[in-house]
């Protein structure tokens, strides 16, 4: 039995979960609604304020899908109830972020500013010009947008300049020692 898959997903107050016969899971909550089609090899049922994920056989691919499906449903329930936030920090001289409407404009040392349009389901928030918060109810989408922002200037190991996640630790390297 999957250690993750066998745990039921608790449904908090204000959240409703519906499952269609073809395994399309719909989760509605105070922050919005998420719909996701799951594999037909897995059984999903809503039983007394919790979602239970089970499997019919022990094939390797079905065992892998068991834990995955439970984790996806749990992420959907958490997303519509609390939401997800990824915080990015801009470290470097002249590295700045600002909002222009729903557009995020980054000054990252290029000859031009980098503009990123907010994808539907995701919103940006800028704190102090050097912190960018990516917020949304879909964990996968929030992570993907944050990774796209980070991709413009990954942190370098010598001075630590670049865009990094808030809790990310950058492994630093020693520079050249030079002649003496």
UniProtKB/Swiss-Prot annotation:
GO aspect biological process, one term: cytoplasmic translation
Domain of life from the UniProt record: Bacteria
SUPFAM superfamilies for the chain: Ribosomal protein L6
Similarity-based family: Belongs to the universal ribosomal protein uL6 family.
Protein name: Large ribosomal subunit protein uL6
Keyword Ribonucleoprotein among record annotations: yes
One MF annotation (Gene Ontology) recorded for this entry: structural constituent of ribosome
Record text on subunit structure and interactions: Part of the 50S ribosomal subunit.
Cellular-component GO terms for this entry: cytosolic large ribosomal subunit
Disulfide bonds: none
Keywords in alphabetical order: Ribonucleoprotein, Ribosomal protein, RNA-binding, rRNA-binding
Record-linked Pfam families: Ribosomal_L6
Cross-referenced NCBIfam families: L6_bact
HAMAP family xref list: Ribosomal_uL6_B (MF_01365_B)
Known role: This protein binds to the 23S rRNA, and is important in its secondary structure. It is located near the subunit interface in the base of the L7/L12 stalk, and near the tRNA binding site of the peptidyltransferase center.
């Amino acid at each position: 039995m999957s250690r993750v898959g066998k745990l039921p997903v608790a449904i908090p107050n204000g959240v409703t979960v519906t499952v269609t016969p073809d395994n399309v899971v719909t989760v509605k909550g105070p922050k919005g609604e998420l719909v996701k089609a799951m594999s037909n090899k897995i059984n999903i049922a809503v039983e007394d304020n919790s979602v239970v994920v089970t499997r019919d056989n022990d094939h390797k691919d079905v065992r892998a899908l068991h834990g995955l499906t439970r984790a996806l449903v749990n992420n959907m329930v958490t997303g519509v109830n609390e939401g997800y936030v990824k915080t990015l920090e801009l470290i470097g001289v002249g590295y700045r972020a600002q909002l222009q409407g729903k557009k995020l404009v980054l000054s990252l040392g290029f000859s031009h500013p980098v503009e990123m349009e907010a994808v539907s389901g995701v919103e940006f928030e800028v704190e102090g010009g050097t912190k960018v918060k990516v917020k949304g109810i879909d964990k996968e989408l929030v992570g993907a947008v944050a990774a796209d922002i980070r991709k413009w200037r990954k942190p370098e190991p010598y001075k630590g300049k670049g865009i990094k996640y808030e809790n990310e630790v950058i492994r630093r390297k020693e520079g050249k020692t030079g002649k003496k």
